[in-house]
Amino acid sequence: LSKGFKVSYSGVCKYIKEVKNKNIPSSQEAFIRGYHPPGESCEFDWGEVKLYIGGKQQRFYMAVFTFSHSNGRYAWLFRHQNTLAFMESHRNFFREVGGAPSMMVYDNMRVAIKEFVGAEKKPTEALLRLSNFYRCHYRFCNARAGWEKGHVERSVEYVRRKAFSVRLRFDSLEDAQNQL
């Protein structure tokens, strides 16, 4: 008003009607890039890979760890995606990097989540033991919220492509693991 504009109730109503007719959302989601200090946070996920071991095609599961700060990636191959493989992969990773990060981030995997109670997720006994032994915390991502754990989602595909795009045939699982 102080700059000479004329504002009326009917003019404001007309403007609101035009905006609604254009189907312009009143608010849009915004994402803030997270910062994680080095070694503080690591994301975990499983991925599948089909390899030929001794001439026979087999399916393996890759346990992939990705540091949130550096995108440093580590992976191990397993025949099963079960609790034993989950715990063994963590032991391998923590030995490899010389300790455990402060926070491990998981999606909604059965080996980490025992049950859902409303929006809350209860950890499995294996995850509780792992967390207590290595003195690291854990966090679960929300369902269908890939931005909460985006590093490792891309890392599974990255590791699979870089490690196994040229060579798919190995004499043993150990040979395939060495390729990683």
Whereabouts are the PLM-identified features?
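Mobile-element integrase/transposase regions
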Residues: 10, 17-73, 81-88
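Acidic/histidine-rich, metal-coordinating catalytic segments
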Residues: 100-119
